[in-house]
Amino acid sequence: MTNEGTRIPGYVSLDKVGNGAPYVLRAGEGEHIAVRSSLRTLLTRQEDTEGHMGLTYCEGDTAPPTPPHYHHDTTEGVYVLSGVLRVWQDDRKGNRIVSDLHPGDFGLLPTGWAHSWAFAAPKTRFIAFYAPGGFEGTLHYLDPHGAPTAEQLGETEKRFDVVWMPDYPLIQESEKTG
């Protein structure tokens, strides 16, 4: 099953403008994909950057966290534009961090660290990058209406650098450090 994207004003298929050629997306343009109660917009993909990176714009209201996961080779970064983004990180060796990121804050989610994030306030917007690119492709495989199914998570594990940990305990509010 693939999430083919929500055709809303500003939808631009990156297959028509990207693939290694330079391009410009105007405000509100990109490949829009509905995921639960949020909208993700692909701005650039692995195939547009010779594999070097992917970049998405994300916006949504308060929502449950993404399934915890980690990457063998991919580093993620998030830059908050508005609202609050709650980020959980765990190096799986005893170092656990949870941070509320506010406008202007940046968070790095390193390779190998288990992590998750959630829209923690209404009208939260942020930019996410992935290096090397590829993980952004998971958005096409997630259910636009609810939490991802085990089948959807398994399919993305086969195609992308991600190991999902749906039963991994997130840090409780009382453990918050940043």
Where is each model-derived feature located?
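A short beta-strand-loop-beta hairpin characteristic of the jelly-roll/cupin
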Residues: 68, 72-103
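Long, hydrophobic/aromatic N-terminal blocks
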Residues: 1-45
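A short glycine-rich, His/Asp/Glu-containing loop-to-beta-strand
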Residues: 27-68, 74
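Conserved hydrophobic/aromatic beta-strand scaffold that supports enzyme active sites
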Residues: 42, 55-59, 77, 98-100, ...
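Short, charged/polar surface micro-motifs in flexible loops or helix N-caps
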Residues: 48-51, 60-64, 84-86, 93, ...
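Short beta-strand His + acidic residue motifs that chelate non-heme Fe in jelly-roll/DSBH
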Residues: 67-68, 87-89, 99, 109, ...
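Double-stranded beta-helix
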Residues: 120-178
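Short acidic-glycine-tyrosine-enriched beta hairpin
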Residues: 26, 48, 91-111
